[in-house]
Amino acid sequence: MRKLTLAIIGAASGIAMMSSVANAASCGKVSITEMNWASSQIITEVAKFLMEQGYGCKVEKVPSATTTAVASLAENGEPDIVTELWLNSTGDAYSKMEKAGKVERLADVLAPGGVEGWWVPEYLVKKHPQLKSVKDVLANPKLVGSRFNNCPDGWGCRIVNDNLAKALKMKAAGMEVFNHGSGETLATSIAAAYEDKKPWFGYYWGPTAVLGKYKMVKLSIGDIDKKVHANNSNKDIANPGVSDFPPAPVLTVVTAAFKKREPAIAELMSKVSFNVDTMNGLLAWKKDQKASAEEAAVRFLNQEKGTWSKWVNADARKKLSAILK
């Protein structure tokens, strides 16, 4: 697998030497975030490859995270591109920059957005087809093991889940709320349940390797009410309500200056969008193979030509098709 990756990159570098000269006038240096989680790193590697080999750019990856990326944009106007920006985690800082015209959103880089919710294993629904909603679970909590697997302390979902548990009166219904100590133990609890085909009920999100590997069914908590959900995101509220998790907008944004300077790259990045199920599959493969983000990106580029070829312009498509046969 690693040899395949290096062979492709090696072949690409030869073409890139010629194409970068031809494109030097049209694409210069580009900086893009390399966030500290797997899905964003794959997106960055795919975008980097397309920009370098298709458009002749010189791409710099900037190690980052949501809050630091937004702060850097506000203070320095860098990096040029921020991808997999979870809008519900940016607070007012990003919206102020957008209103001021300093940054522009180009694309929903994950479609239909980040997914959050309460899940049960598919095998449990096959065994108990009446389990279609959280209301069904609370009517007979023993079917799911009488336990709700909650987020660790410090996570935003922990606050929302705690408020939902109060609003739904879960403890009174006979449901234990088990607060995991880490994301690792939460993920392990799903793996252990699947191995033994045991009941499991709890919170999870995507795109993640877990949802890519294990077939889970998202149960309806209720209608989506954005005001109720926003209120549930606050600690120690007196009036928690019931609302399902709305899809989380996950964006690619650029500085206004970069969009003006590199319109062709801005157009490319406006089209780069990964289906959440596709990303789940890539993340599961990456974990199983102990692969790097670069290797996962190459897998995507080799297997999803019908997708990425629609993102690039005709000239870039010709160059990339010569590399990724």
Question: Model features per residue range: what roles?
Answer:
Residues 102-152:
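A conserved helix-loop-strand patch within extracytoplasmic ligand-binding domains
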Residues 22-32, 139-146, 309-311, 325:
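Immediate post-signal peptide segment of exported/extracytoplasmic ligand-binding proteins
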Residues 28, 39, 164-173, 180-197, ...:
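An extracytoplasmic/periplasmic, membrane-proximal ligand-sensing/linker region
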Residues 39-57:
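Short, polar/charged alpha-helical segment
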Residues 208-273:
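C-terminal lobe and pocket-closing loops
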Residues 25-39, 57-62, 145-149, 269:
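Short, well-ordered beta-strand elements
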Residues 116-126, 249-261, 284-285:
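A bilobed periplasmic-binding-protein/Venus flytrap-type ligand-binding module shared by bacterial periplasmic
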Residues 71-73, 79-83, 154-234:
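Ligand-binding pocket segment of bilobal, Venus flytrap-like solute-binding proteins
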